[in-house]
């Protein structure tokens, strides 16, 4: 479960940082 949402959160955070 966590292994499925982890990449989603990582991608979201990366998108916010690499604005």
Swiss-Prot record:
Keyword tags: Amidation, Amphibian defense peptide, Cytolysis, Hemolysis, Secreted
GO terms classed as biological process: defense response; hemolysis in another organism
Gene Ontology cellular component annotations, sorted alphabetically: extracellular region
Cell compartments where the protein resides: Secreted
Tissue expression from the record: Expressed by the skin glands.
Keyword Secreted on entry: yes
Iron in keyword set: no
Record PTM Arginine amide, positions in chain: 19
Function comment: Has hemolytic activity against human erythrocytes. May have antimicrobial activity.
Name the record gives this protein: Hylin-b1
Organism: Boana lundii
Lineage, opening ranks: Eukaryota, Metazoa, Chordata, Craniata, Vertebrata
């Amino acid at each position: 479960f966590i292994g499925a949402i982890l990449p989603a959160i990582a991608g979201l955070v990366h998108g916010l940082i690499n604005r």
